């Protein structure tokens, strides 16, 4: 409502289909395509938490749900054994049916929840799953999770897996992501892959990368972005700002100079 009442955009509205015809600004719902994107952050964290509870509490019956909740509330202090078992549970990003099915469920629930509401402009809310850098900020404000994640740790970036959880390589990660119906994310999603530069120098490596990406899209994937970087150079650039001004990294649908991040 603030944009509608105090921040109209007449120039851009002139260039948007529907606004001139209806005599309404885009902030007033004049556009033909009048949707508002809302990003879901923490898909993998939620899926991993559900999978860990399923595995440790219900399948193995190693601990009760009360014991898991108690450990989470304590940030696993004095409950390191429970945390180790939760961390060892199946994780999204490894082409495993259980956590991947939970990720699909989380995405569908998020889509269904948004579909029940409309914006102040009268348009639909549509889901997307890209976090830019807010997965770090959100994680810093969130308590521990049943996935084994400790208080304050970053969430998974966009639609990727949690940090360090992809143990079966990039093909498995892409297979997990491809199980999510891209039609449930009309506002898009981001999936980041990172590779060490020395591994990508040969023609054969580039051919493997091409096949990897093409296979992902053939299975219904929507978006993947690649960072091919030398970790040593990144560390040097971080510790010595200005020494490597030309390093460009992919963030979330856009590129940025590493020095400026």
Show where each model-derived region lies.
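Acidic, glycine-enriched catalytic cores built around paired aspartates
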Residues: 1-261
């Amino acid at each position: 409502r603030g944009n509608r009442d105090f921040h109209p955009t007449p120039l851009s509205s002139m260039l948007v289909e529907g606004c001139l015809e209806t005599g309404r600004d885009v902030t007033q719902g004049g556009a033909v395509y009048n949707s508002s994107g809302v990003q879901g952050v923490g898909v993998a964290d939620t899926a991993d938490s559900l999978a860990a509870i399923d595995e440790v509490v219900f399948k193995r019956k190693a601990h009760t749900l009360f014991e898991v909740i108690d450990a989470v509330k304590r940030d696993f202090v004095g409950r390191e054994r429970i945390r180790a078992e939760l961390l060892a549970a199946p994780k999204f990003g490894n082409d495993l049916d259980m956590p991947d099915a939970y990720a699909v469920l989380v995405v569908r629930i998020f889509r269904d929840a948004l579909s029940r509401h409309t914006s102040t402009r009268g348009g639909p809310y549509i889901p997307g799953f890209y976090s830019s850098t807010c997965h770090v900020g959100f994680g810093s404000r969130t308590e521990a999770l049943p996935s084994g994640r400790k208080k304050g740790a970053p969430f998974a970036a966009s639609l990727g897996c949690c940090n360090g959880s992809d143990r079966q390589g990039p093909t498995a990660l892409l297979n997990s992501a491809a199980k999510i119906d891209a039609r449930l994310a009309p506002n898009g999603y981001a999936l980041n892959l990172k590779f060490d530069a020395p591994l990508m120098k040969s023609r054969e490596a580039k051919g493997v990368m091409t096949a990897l990406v093409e296979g992902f899209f053939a299975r219904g994937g929507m978006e993947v972005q690649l960072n091919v970087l030398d970790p040593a150079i990144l560390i040097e650039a971080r510790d010595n700002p200005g020494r490597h001004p030309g390093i460009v990294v992919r963030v979330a649908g856009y590129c940025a100079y590493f020095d400026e991040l």
